[in-house]
A protein has these predicted regions:
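Conserved, single-site charged/polar hotspot
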Residues: 1-369
């Protein structure tokens, strides 16, 4: 069976601890498969292609098994800081199939399980762990820098585009015009109010060695004047992050810039990368699955230095069978009770605290002193 907590269904057992603040910490203990049911369906969506869901199931499994800690009250958190976990949804049949069919599969490098980082969208190019988190001194084994046309081609990948007409007339957004006029005035040493032409644009200076789609600087050669009189050419160079400062782009969750000339005569600067960009792009995997690629092809693309391996893990129990799940053996000093009716579990010790769930009748509750 399951218990409802904050509107979501959770399988397994709950360990509760009253914190010094008076609030209760709730820890859900479940078998690996049931944990993955609650991750895959929320890190992706049950509507994603089944092969993308299988790739997510393998990646999420390797990540949790590589990052569990035994030093605290729980093994891993349930937010996007680690992996999103939101319990069990019986209607997520694609998710359940993806988890069950790949349960014993992992990725390994030199005989050791790979910590499989992944994120929503890389913006068209992957990064290495050592580049994303230099202070952690992580190994790059299993990873590579590569262009990702699948992420880039997915219409659901987050992107903002800045357009500049080069050697032709064309529209410039008000925010970009304000930025160019301000920077041209500063460079020329007097106020200008008109852009008379843009002659070249480039986004350059890779933020990370070996990358081509994460640039830190932009150079623009243009002509500017005061009401068209005495037009002067000037080359502006500035950090790409300044597009945000001037309100040319708005999305603070995006982390990378790169650019290219298109066939219509516009230079386009792309503001991309929703997430760290290391390992699997979930939007890229979605596009690859839609194109008919298998989960193994998806994983090999994003973790090219890894090999498939297997682990010995128990088959998933039937979530509906009340006798299935994790066997729980209490320890320490406790009082055992069986609920005869629904019992409200509150966020703190006392009726003044809000109810977060109702423990069903017939549940075994252990209260520790």
């Amino acid at each position: 069976g399951y218990i409802k907590l904050n509107g979501r269904c959770y399988l397994g057992h709950f360990n509760l601890k009253v914190m010094s603040s008076g609030y209760i910490r709730v820890v859900n203990e479940v078998p690996l498969a049931h944990y993955l049911y609650g991750v895959v369906g929320h890190e992706m969506s049950n509507t994603f292609p089944i092969e993308a869901l299988k790739a997510q199931a393998v990646a999420a499994k390797c990540y949790v098994l590589s990052n569990m800690t035994t030093s605290g009250d729980y093994y891993i958190g349930d937010t996007s800081a680690e992996q999103v976990y939101k319990g069990y949804n019986a209607s997520y049949t694609n998710v359940i199939e993806a988890v069950d069919s790949t349960l014993d599969e992992i990725l390994a490098v030199n005989g050791r399980m790979l910590c499989t980082y992944y994120a929503a969208s890389n913006g068209g190019e992957t990064l290495l762990p050592s580049q994303a988190w230099p202070s952690k001194r992580l190994s790059d084994g299993g990873y590579d820098i590569r262009l990702d046309p699948y992420d880039l081609g997915n219409a659901y990948s987050k992107m903002e585009t800045v357009k500049l007409p080069v050697n032709m007339g064309g529209e410039i957004s008000p925010a970009l015009m304000n930025m160019l006029l301000d920077k041209a005035s500063r460079a020329l040493g007097y106020q200008v109010n008109q852009i008379d032409g843009i002659y070249s644009v480039s986004v350059h200076s890779p933020k990370y060695s070996g990358t081509s789609r994460c640039m830190s600087k932009c150079s623009i050669e243009l002509a500017a004047s005061q009401n068209g009189m005495g037009s002067e050419r000037v080359t502006l160079e500035f950090y790409t992050s300044e597009f945000e400062s001037y309100g040319v782009v708005y999305d603070k969750t995006l982390r990378a810039y790169w650019g290219e000339m298109d066939s219509s005569g516009y230079y386009k600067i792309y503001h991309v990368r929703f997430g760290h960009g290391v390992g699997m792009s979930q939007r890229g995997a979605q596009a690859m699955g839609s194109a008919g690629m298998s989960y193994r092809e998806i994983l090999k693309f994003y973790y090219p230095g890894a090999s498939f391996a297997s682990i010995d893990v128990s088959a998933p129990q039937d979530p509906i069978n009340k006798n299935s799940g994790v066997e729980f053996t209490p320890s320490g000093s406790f009082v055992e009770a069986v609920t005869t009716g629904g019992v409200k579990l509150r966020s703190g010790a006392g009726t003044k605290y809000s109810s977060i769930c109702t423990v069903p009748a017939g549940s075994t509750v252990y209260v520790y002193g």
